């Protein structure tokens, strides 16, 4: 009797095993219709702009001077800011901007990316914002890993570039962006200028002037050259109407 039960049990188990090995086409049952299959450059740009908008509005200085006070988390009020670092910029907006540039330059992805604006204009805006972030970072932390950065496991310890080299990289970044700007469609997802490339050109030139002023004591000759290049073009922000603004929500 026991042997019979064992044989029946083995037969049932074997049947289940062989049945489970059948190749069954379940169609799109396991495909998420809401899951994106590729990064969308317009969304990457919006997220990068949202993150960058807080760079110039850090509250630490107000807390240092006790114009405001903290309760539950009094770190800044106690000057406990030694742990501040640039990791969130590398893994946040800069990573998004790098991806925008990559998608608009890749032979297999640029056609799809162009649905969200002219390829070169998207690259130009990404480079301008990237230079803006980079200036903030080097002014705060000095030397930064840049030329060897973003290589992942191929180079987990990239070298640090000097602040002097970083500024030269930023000037090149802005000038490359200015050369790319054209009359084509501006980028979708641009919540700052709404894809208006003329305003991005004004901002890029004004950023170049700001960078020149920042190095005027360290390298007066270079600062003078870069500043005068913009002045001679006459193409820079000269009124509040062209200011770079990030609007949170609506005005209602």
Residue ranges and their predicted role:
Residues 1-9:
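Bacterial N-terminal signal peptides that target proteins for export
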Residues 21-26, 168-186, 197-252:
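Aromatic-residue-lined binding/catalytic grooves and analogous aromatic/hydrophobic interfacial grooves
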Residues 70-189:
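Conserved, well-structured interaction surfaces
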